From Swiss-Prot:
SMART domains: DEXDc (SM00487), HELICc (SM00490). ATP binds at residues 41-48. Residues 28-188 form the Helicase ATP-binding domain. Transmembrane segments: none annotated. The gene is uvrB. Residues 432-598 form the Helicase C-terminal domain. This is UvrABC system protein B. It comes from Mycobacterium ulcerans (strain Agy99). A motif (Beta-hairpin) lies at residues 94-117. GO terms for molecular function: ATP binding; ATP hydrolysis activity; DNA binding; excinuclease ABC activity; helicase activity. GO terms for cellular component: cytoplasm; excinuclease repair complex.
């Protein structure tokens, strides 16, 4: 039975610009029963905020799909801030590193599955599924990972352990139940997914929680239930009932597992006869050894490595049928929002083929049973069957979503800040580098930044070297730059440590750089993916967050793609200017905190201290997981000021404690992949340490 509060947006701002009309029209179309609705939202118009207000209007559980983990995290963060009293969850692949199992027949090379799982992301995945099965006020922000196989929601719910004060549950019986759903007993190291026993007290850290659960028995009855801090043991709150969901999504009861083992053995016998009949004795031997080992593991402990390859048997599905996915955890009336749909929709359609081609080899050469191919992502048709009403968000909607909506779309091009789309200027290629250098110097003098996009890696490298020779502060962003370094480069650009960023594909959706006033597109007339109309519009959008934003296209002719991009930009710009004039709006520069570019999902650990301060019987943590209180992004130092106090007047001991506190926050941010935030803490700590050394040198305390 799903419970939960109503969706409620908490924001210091009201809808503005095109937002009110867009929200009303989206709501009207969805309530009228339209299955597919497109929101054409220009860069910087507040599509995420529009989504939050739409969810509040419709009061329906919502899945928001984003094209990658970074944008999913950014979206989740924004929605958490606007929906602080609801469950905004984050569901992406939990692998930090993943090498899938594969066999290369040409070289007779078997590559064993190798992966590194991020425990925090795994917890957030469990948090999403447990929230979906227990409440309705849920928004899940997910990557394309949500179309991959997951255990069935019915098994996940059926195998959960419900606890209530006053009920009779023998302690040893509870321990057996916990082991059955893959919790491990560990009285020495208390970690997520484990439990420990101390006399009549059992303590568990559920797979989806940062807090532990304490169950106190009196005889065979449950006397009390508490949430507590797993490290200190301090009680956070007392509850009357709770539900412990399984530690893995692939879980089955003893009867279901026995049936699965029986059908696996039947399939194994059939496949071995087939392989041996074709003289493939080596393949048959491989398959027999591996499968029998896995069966024995499942028989003894209810689990085995790679159990997902047997998911068809465990779920009791027929051959060729689609697996259960995150979509199956939603109620039937859920709303789907696809962000950056021009990128995300093709991703969804392409996942199945890449997966099936790899698994065919594994089956053919005896590494897996044929049923392993049924542990797979959804095909496009299967995905379409599982979704209901869908809202597509994009500045450049793709052909699929436009065809689904009959070519109609809701438009959101007027920004709440009054900012207008940049001017587009076409310049000849002759003397383009000298012209570019002049433009760069003009902007560097007034503390503005420049993005330059080229067509090839060689051209980007040569241009970067030449600009350096000319005394320009420039950096080069390319595909080999890792995530941490990429975020650091963007941060340095915004801080003014250099003035120009050169790259090949700088149209990155979500690249949010308000300081950039010029985007230079070299070889704009060379038709291709990087110079298509859609790509050009996305690239133009990178200059749309600056009052004096301009785009310079260097080309000797105007291609059809250029004309389409320029015409669309001019159309939007004319509408924006007319709106500003009619309403007396003066465009305001976007002031976005530099630490906010790529802030990732806040973890539950962020508010554990605040939760601990709530007395037993109090309201405890906010019901929505992983959320800081509104307007409390964590303590930070800014220009020598901390929480309103001048750090130069702080006592030495207090300053040392502050450094220790910020160091701890830096480590948490780095662990959670909040690299920009971690770098900001690092710089602040360095400044404070200088101040501390100065105090020591002066003999001050």
């Amino acid at each position: 039975m799903r419970t939960g509060a109503s969706f409620e947006v908490i924001s210091p701002h009201d809808p503005a610009g095109d937002q009110p009309a867009a929200i009303n029209e989206l709501e009207r179309r969805i309530r009228a029963g339209e299955r597919d609705v497109v929101l054409l939202g220009a860069t910087g118009t507040g599509k995420s905020a529009t989504t939050a207000w739409l969810i509040e209007r419709l009061q329906r559980p919502t899945l928001v799909m984003a094209p990658n983990k970074t944008l999913a995290a950014q979206l989740a963060n924004e929605l958490r801030e606007m929906l602080p009293h609801n469950a905004v969850e984050y569901f992406v692949s939990y692998y930090d590193y993943y090498q899938p199992e594969a066999y290369i027949a040409q070289t007779d090379t078997y590559i064993e599955k190798d992966s590194s799982i991020n425990d925090d992301v795994e917890r957030l995945r469990h948090s999403a599924t447990s929230a979906l099965l227990s409440r309705r006020d849920v928004v899940v922000v997910a990557s394309v990972s949500c179309i991959y196989g997951l255990g069935t929601p019915q098994s996940y719910l059926d195998r959960s352990v419900e606890l209530q004060v006053g009920t009779d549950v023998p302690r040893d019986g509870l321990l057996r139940l916990l082991v059955d759903v893959q919790y491990t007993r560990n009285d020495l190291s208390f970690t997520r997914g484990s439990f420990r026993v101390r006399g009549d007290t059992v303590e568990i850290i559920p797979s989806y929680e940062d807090l532990a659960v304490r169950i106190e028995f009196f005889g065979d009855g449950i006397e009390a239930l508490y949430y507590l801090h797993p490290l200190t043991g301090d009680v956070v709150r007392q509850v009357d009932s709770l539900r412990i969901f399984p530690a893995t999504h692939y879980v089955a009861g003893p009867e279901r597992m026995a049936q699965a083992i029986s059908t696996i053995e039947e399939e194994l016998a059939e496949r071995l006869a087939e392989l041996e009949g074709h003289g493939k004795l080596l393949e048959a031997h491989r398959l027999r050894m591996r499968t029998n080992y896995d069966i024995e593991m499942m028989r003894q402990v209810g689990f085995c490595s790679g159990i997902e390859n047997y998911s068809r048997h465990i779920d009791g599905r027929p051959a060729g049928s689609a697996p259960a996915t995150l979509l199956d955890y939603f109620p039937e009336d859920f709303l789907l929002v696809i962000d950056e749909s021009h990128v995300t929709v093709p991703q969804i359609g392409g996942m199945y083929e890449g997966d099936i081609s790899r698994k065919r080899n594994l089956v053919e050469f005896g590494f897996r049973l044929p049923s392993a191919v049924d542990n797979r992502p959804l095909q496009w048709e299967e995905f379409a069957d599982r979704i209901g009403q869908t809202v597509y968000l994009s500045a450049t909607p793709g052909p699929y979503e436009l065809s689904q909506s009959g070519g109609e779309f809701v438009e959101q091009v007027i920004r709440p800040t009054g900012l207008v789309d940049p001017k587009v200027v076409v310049k000849p290629t002759k003397g383009q580098i000298d012209d570019l250098i002049g433009e760069i110097r003009q902007r560097a003098e007034v503390d503005q930044r420049v993005l330059v996009t080229t067509l090839t890696k060689k051209m980007a490298e040569d241009l970067t070297d030449y600009l350096l020779e000319m005394g320009i502060r420039v950096r080069y962003l390319h595909s080999e730059v890792d995530t941490l370094r990429r975020v650091e480069l963007l941060r340095q650009l915004r801080l003014g440590e250099y003035d120009v960023l050169v790259g090949i594909n700088l149209l990155r959706e979500g690249l949010d750089l308000p300081e950039v006033s010029l985007v230079a597109i070299l070889d704009a007339d060379k038709e291709g993916f990087l110079r298509s109309a859609r790509s050009l519009i996305q690239t133009i959008g990178r200059a749309a967050r600056n009052v004096s934003g301009e785009v310079h296209m260097y080309a000797d002719k105007i291609t059809d793609s250029m004309k389409e991009a320029i015409d669309e930009t001019e159309r939007r710009r004319a509408k924006q200017v007319a709106y500003n004039e009619a309403n007396g709006i003066d465009p305001q520069p976007l002031r976005k905190k530099i630490a906010d570019i790529l802030d990732q999902v806040y973890r539950e650990a962020d508010d554990t201290e605040a939760a601990e301060s709530v007395p037993i019987g109090g309201s405890g943590r906010n019901s929505s997981r992983g959320r800081r209180a509104q307007g409390e992004p964590g303590r930070a130092v800014s220009a020598g000021v901390f929480e309103g106090r001048d750090t130069s007047t702080m006592p030495r001991a207090e300053l040392a404690d502050l450094i220790k506190d910020l160091t701890s926050q830096m480590m948490v941010a780095a662990r959670d992949l909040q690299f920009e935030l971690a770098a900001r803490f690092r710089d602040e700590i360095a400044d404070l340490k200088k101040e501390l050394r100065g105090m020591d040198a002066a003999g001050l305390n």
